[in-house]
């Protein structure tokens, strides 16, 4: 089995689907993150060309990645005037730390939630709408 797949009783996770879930982004945004991470600070047009996507699609993905804290925008000043932006991905190790921390929080919250469930409340919730 691939190291990028995780089978659980409910589903099979891919790393990009896990990133999408943790960071609230689209699976397609993850490709943009890894392109920037691999190639270093990049302009939107360069990213779009490398991954064969429309500029506007890449712009939306980069905005999602910035909102999630995975990518930062930096202004580069041109010597004779003007500027342009490049986008830089946070290091992969930092991304992994955030994912692990988020998963630990989820796990702790789920354990607490299950611990606090009362049988009577669960029965009432799931059986009250059943017609006799």
Curated annotation (Swiss-Prot):
A Pfam family hit: TrmB
Source taxon at top rank: Archaea
Record-linked InterPro entries: ArsR-like_HTH, TrmB-like, Tscrpt_reg_TrmB_N, WH-like_DNA-bd_sf, WH_DNA-bd_sf
Leader sequence residues: none
Ranges annotated as spanning the membrane: none
Chain coiled-coil ranges: none
Official protein name in the record: Uncharacterized protein MJ1503
């Amino acid at each position: 089995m691939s190291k990028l797949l995780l089978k659980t009783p409910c589903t099979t996770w891919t790393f990009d689907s896990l990133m999408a879930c943790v960071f609230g982004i689209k699976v397609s945004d993850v490709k943009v993150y890894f392109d920037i991470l691999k190639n270093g600070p990049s302009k939107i047009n360069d990213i779009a060309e490398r991954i064969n996507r429309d500029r506007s699609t890449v712009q939306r993905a980069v905005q999602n990645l910035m909102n999630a804290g995975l990518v930062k925008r930096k202004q580069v000043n041109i010597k004779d005037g003007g500027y342009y932006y490049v986008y830089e991905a946070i290091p992969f190790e930092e991304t992994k730390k955030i994912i692990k921390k988020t998963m630990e929080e989820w796990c702790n919250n789920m354990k607490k939630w299950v611990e606090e469930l009362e049988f009577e409340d669960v029965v009432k919730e799931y059986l009250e709408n059943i017609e006799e």
